[in-house]
Swiss-Prot record:
This is Ribonuclease clavin. Belongs to the ribonuclease U2 family. Residues 102-117 have a biased composition (Basic and acidic residues). Residues 98-117 are annotated as: Disordered. It comes from Aspergillus clavatus. GO terms for molecular function: RNA binding; RNA endonuclease activity; RNA nuclease activity. Its main location: secreted. Clavin has the same substrate specificity as alpha-sarcin. It is specific for purines in both single- and double-stranded RNA. Its toxic action on eukaryotic cells is the result of cleavage of a single phosphodiester bond in the 60S subunit of ribosomes.
Length: 177
């Protein structure tokens, strides 16, 4: 009888432990970028909503070389964010505010981009399906698509995702998340 009571007590304890809520896993942010793309059937531009997973974009950034334009494709390269190399805002430009002090500070970008005290933003292609961009592709280089993951040099801190407003040309605008 004692054995049965102990067995019931162990079973109830196990059920209670399994029924306790576990912490929820934080989901990766989804970034939404708007981009005009030409419809091949109508030959007219249409607004497309492109979705990017932040974990994939961060992975793209971490797999990219830590260089400024020194690859076959020229990616990654400096994202000026409206600044010159000395951290002064260029006339008529408004820098994107990322909400992260590493990303928001004015850059220091030496002539070759790898000075001892350099800190600036890099841009690297990112894709909705998360595949890695072939940064060593030469002419014809792989299509980088409309979106870029932005991160810091030299620490590779993720800042955000920006996209061209029309296909792979024009201004880069901050995507929403």
């Amino acid at each position: 009888m004692v054995a049965i009571k102990n067995l019931v007590l162990v079973a109830l304890t196990a059920v209670t432990a399994l029924a306790m809520p576990s912490p929820l896993e934080e989901r990766a942010a989804t970034w939404t970028c708007m981009n005009e793309q030409k419809n091949p059937k109508t030959n007219k531009y249409e607004n497309k909503r492109l979705l990017y997973n932040q974990n994939n974009a961060e992975s793209n950034a971490h797999h990219a070389p830590l260089s400024d334009g020194k690859t076959g494709s020229s990616y990654p390269h400096w994202f000026t964010n409206g600044y010159d190399g000395d951290g002064k805002i260029l006339k008529g430009r408004t820098p994107i505010k990322w909400g992260n002090s590493d990303c928001d500070r004015p850059p220091k970008h030496s002539k070759n981009g790898d000075g001892k005290n350099d800190h600036y933003l890099l841009e690297f292609p990112t894709f909705p399906d998360g595949h890695q961009y072939n940064f060593d592709s030469k002419k014809p280089k792989e299509d980088p698509g409309p979106a870029r993951v932005i991160y810091t040099y030299p620490n590779k801190v993720f800042c955000g995702i920006v996209a061209h407003t029309r296909e792979n040309q024009g201004d880069l605008k901050l995507c929403s998340h």
